[in-house]
Amino acid sequence: MAMAFKMATTGMRVTDECTSSFMDMKWKKVHRYIVFKIEEKSRKVTVDKVGGAGESYHDLEDSLPVDDCRYAVFDFDFVTVDNCRKSKIFFIAWSPEASKIRAKILYATSKDGLRRVLEGIHYELQATDPTEMGFDIIQDRAK
């Protein structure tokens, strides 16, 4: 698989699967969320897990490891007070306290490069524990 984009800060490359999965989520609504991971040896950002259209935010939370960093995008559909259907895409930088310092640094320095490739993100959250990215926070930010 060809690497279409290179992250300037760390030399990490984003695989085509990352961008195509994101576009499928954004435009075709076939995914509810995508979890990305960095493969340090191959210096690539890859898709770790894809949540189907019927999965929930809680499924995304459950798919994040308690001791390692990840990136995730979540497509949040909601209805406004004016009864309009809306969709907002959240980017989540997950860096739990139990993860290794090296992983935290690697994910922190690679984040902006991935964000540039994933066009159409509305909001960003950075979380070190589940309370910093709870569903109530997603709902409040989307208003």
Swiss-Prot record:
SUPFAM superfamilies (alphabetical): Actin depolymerizing proteins (SSF55753)
Cytoplasm in keyword set: yes
An individual GO BP term: actin filament bundle assembly
Pfam families to which the protein is assigned, alphabetical: Cofilin_ADF
GO CC terms in record: actin cytoskeleton; cytosol
Family classification: Belongs to the actin-binding proteins ADF family.
Protein name per UniProt: Actin-depolymerizing factor 5
Organism encoding this protein: Arabidopsis thaliana
Lineage: Eukaryota, Viridiplantae, Streptophyta, Embryophyta, Tracheophyta
